[in-house]
Amino acid sequence: MKKVLFGLFALSTVAMAAETNLYLRAGADLNGEYDVINYEGTKVNKDEADDFSWEIAVEATREIYLKVELGLGLAYQKHGDAKSAFNHEVYGENEWDDTTLEMAGYTSIPLYIVAKYNFDAINNFVPYIKANLGYSFNDGDGDFKMSGLSEDGTLEGEVKGNVKIDDGLYYGIGAGFEYNNFTMDLMYQVNEAEAEVTVSELDVKTKKDYDYSRVTLSFGYKFNF
């Protein structure tokens, strides 16, 4: 909550200035991918995101030079969980065959600088390019789970592990257009993170990169103040 309040305070400071553009955006990820976590040769997850991923954002900018806007942005980004990894053999006190490994996804709240360049209008359409750079505050959405199946397909056992997601860099680059204050753009975005997975029952602890990257299609509206 403190992170959100700090971001809103920073945005409001920019928005109170004269000749400010305030953008509200909502978007959906087209092809989300996670870094694959490997532990001693075993893949904990697949790289594809399994669930629908979306975001909402607010950005306040000012024109600092002809056609050039600079400002701050704050977003709430709900990343889908990574797809489960299957068919591993795990040996320990217990033994599972055809093991399913489930790795939790995470939610990000990035606070970032946004830079935007507007090209000349074409029939009321204003093409633009933009770039974001900031810091992503990340929060894990669940536990690590490992479950095994017996030969007849019944659940034989399940082990859960704690997942801690560290914060990291956020950046994005893309292009779009504005028409009568409505906007549409495509952005390639990356939230950097590290995941620390602890499975006390198996005496396992590992920390690996767990970045989330994707192309996001967004629609929005610009308010002029």
Residue ranges and their predicted role:
Residues A26-Y34, L74-G80, T107-I109, F119, ...:
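Transmembrane beta-strands of outer-membrane beta-barrel pores
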Residues M1-N21, F225:
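Cleavable N-terminal export/targeting peptides
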Residues E33-I37, H79-K83, Y171-F225:
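Predominantly the C-terminal beta-signal and adjacent terminal strand-loop region
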Residues L22-A26, L70-L74, I113-A115, I129-L133, ...:
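Membrane-embedded beta-strand positions of outer-membrane beta-barrel proteins
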Residues A18-T20, E63-K67, D120-N124, Y179-F182, ...:
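Outer-membrane beta-barrel channels and translocator barrels
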Residues A17-R62, G140, R214-T216, K222-N224:
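Short glycine/proline- and aromatic-enriched beta-strand/turn motifs that initiate or cap beta-hairpins
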Residues D50-I56, G105-L111, F125, I165-Y171, ...:
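Residues that define the transmembrane beta-barrel architecture of outer-membrane proteins
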Residues Y34-K43, A82-E95, D139-E156, E194-V204:
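Outer-membrane beta-barrel translocator domains and adjoining extracellular loop/strand segments
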